[in-house]
Amino acid sequence: MLEEILQYNKEFVESKAYEKYAASKYPNKKLAILSCMDTRLTELLPAALGLKNGDAKIIKNAGGIIADPFGSVMRSLLIAVHTLGVEHILVIGHTDC
């Protein structure tokens, strides 16, 4: 599987297919989202919210929870707010988690 991924990435870079995904590190909609890492949400969540690449900082973990007030999720949200201009935070769960 690793060889397939590396080959795809090589072709992706050589063809400059990445250019259509270019975005600022600052989220266009000043939005951060904490959600579950469930694979069913990979494309579904942004599509359901009308988000494009660069619109939001999306933080994912098992269950979409803040388990530790000093952990990596809180650190990511603090950086999003204080460094990257985020003004809105959504915590989005889902059924059948």
Predicted regions and their residues:
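Short HxH-centered metal-ligating active-site micro-motif
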Residues: 53-97
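Short, conserved "active-site rim" segments that organize catalytic pockets and cofactor/ligand binding
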Residues: 1-66
